[in-house]
């Protein structure tokens, strides 16, 4: 299939936008915006999935309506966060895999199996692995999604996941930079504002990012948490300091940087949709995600 290259400013900006939708088939407004080049990517959820045949037909239809091409993405971490379940290959969550014998090899192999299935279904990008360090057992948004509380272990296992997925042709997105592990506040419902020191973030929380970047991570997802030591005004997702100075500058990352979903209340309680999208772009974000 031959794709066009975006030429107008509107289509160039549109290629930064990722959206979700309700239902097992794409609504007309999504297909229209794809044809116009005003959407660059789609994020799939369980609400879009019935079985493998239906999902493959859905991704085919999205591509058929996208002259500029469309990137299909999903959260398929395994365990508690998996959009593909019955009829698909299921994986244990990160913490369970981290408890297994020969865990590094197992995680790389399991990621490769999942990657092969995702590619066959027409999916390109998996928002995984979670590389947050587990600090609180009652962290409502983390739970067993993390590889654990030891930064060296998390680094080794997260890098294995990146290698496995990307060897199978699926882009990964270690998340949530620089960390969503320091709070018991769920960013789906509120904006955490924390006093964690920059030195701690550098020495501990950014260790898995150094490892996954070295492993070739195609993208990094930025958290909605506000760290006062980094930027007292903006949450990380909307912060040029975090994206440009810390991720791009200090870590030397030159891959794709994506927001977490801008419809989470950590953002919507403080910013409108258009405002948050513009601020994210100005911060240096490449992919702007709405669900």
Language-model features: locations:
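Alpha-helical scaffold segments that flank or form the walls of functional sites
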Residues: 99-123, 205, 214, 276-282
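Catalytic domains of carbohydrate-active enzymes, especially glycoside hydrolases
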Residues: 32-45, 113-125
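Short, conserved phosphate-binding/catalytic loop or strand-edge motifs used
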Residues: 131-141
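Second-shell residues forming the walls of enzyme active-site clefts
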Residues: 8, 20, 26-29, 47-66, ...
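Short, conserved acidic/polar surface loops in the N-terminal third of protein domains
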Residues: 82-87, 93, 137-139
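A charged helix-plus-loop insertion that forms the helical arch/lid used to bind
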Residues: 88-103, 146-148
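N-terminal basic, low-complexity leaders that serve as flexible interaction/assembly modules and, when applicable
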Residues: 1-39
